[in-house]
Regions:
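Domain-level detector for secreted/extracellular nuclease and nuclease-toxin modules, and
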Residues: 3-10, 16-258
Length: 258
């Protein structure tokens, strides 16, 4: 009988220790810094069609047939990805119609412009393939796409290598009431594009944004740079809701001109 009681006591002690350890571990987790995962996402509402892929998250607009925004974090390691598969532009099966298709861009005179660029997604064949989905694509002027926009993309990768990672949100801007359209599904042609960047430095968070007209733009990134606050005021959206507001009110170009 005494042996039986001893066994029961040992079992109870083990259970109590397990529970105590469990609460201790939970406390340790809660004491850790908040993960940066998801910090690249802008504020969004419950009625937006949010699409999550390996390399980016997008909010797809079924009226414009363009993403309202595309967000991703690019790390230093990801900039050296070696994946180089060739993939077709495709509609995204994860979103319902109406949505853009290849036929909309055929002979339109507009580039299929990546928001999250192919070069940022070469760390994974899946991420690379998904960068060609139309939830990541907008009609872009060819010169702007290959000149001004490309230079901003290259600057972004340099910042990821320099600072370890960069948070990125970009997308189209529609200024005019009467939008240009292309294709049988009437994909709206953006008037401008924005791109907002944030990096963590020893002096705190640093941000910058760019606004580029969707025409024959060839300028340097500096010529399009504005405070993130300026873009947020136009869009009516907080692009980096987890960051301090003061980090978005101005930019120090010396941080980005490297």
């Amino acid at each position: 009988m005494q042996l039986h009681k001893n066994r029961i006591m040992l079992m109870l002690t083990a259970v109590l220790l397990f529970v105590a350890c469990g609460y201790s571990q939970q406390g340790d987790v809660l004491a850790q810094p908040v993960s940066a995962s998801g910090a690249e996402l802008p504020a969004y509402t419950s009625d937006e069609d949010i699409v999550r892929h390996a390399g980016y998250t997008a909010s797809y607009n079924h009226t414009t047939l363009c993403p309202d925004w595309v967000a991703w974090e690019l790390t230093s390691d990801e900039t050296s990805g070696q994946c180089n598969g060739q993939y077709p532009f495709s509609w995204d099966t994860s979103v319902e119609f109406p949505k853009a298709t290849r036929e909309d861009y055929s002979n339109s005179g507009w580039d299929k412009g990546h928001m999250a660029p192919r070069a940022d997604m070469k760390w994974s064949e899946q991420a690379l393939a998904e960068s060609y989905l139309f939830t990541n694509i907008c009609p872009q002027d060819h010169v702007m796409n290959s000149q001004a926009w490309r230079k901003i993309e290259e600057l972004t990768r340099r910042m990821a290598r320099r600072h370890g990672s960069v948070l990125i949100v970009c997308g189209p801007m529609f200024d005019s009431v009467a939008h240009r359209h292309i294709g049988p599904n009437c994909v709206h042609v953006p008037d401008r594009f924005f791109k907002a960047l944030a990096v963590s430095t020893s002096g705190g968070w640093q941000t910058v944004a760019f606004i580029v007209e969707n025409n024959r733009q060839k300028g340097s990134p500096r010529s399009y740079a504005v405070p993130v606050d300026d873009v947020e005021a136009i869009l009516g959206r907080d692009l980096f809701p987890t960051l301090p507001d003061e980090a978005e009110r101005q930019f120090n170009w010396n941080i980005w001109n490297r």
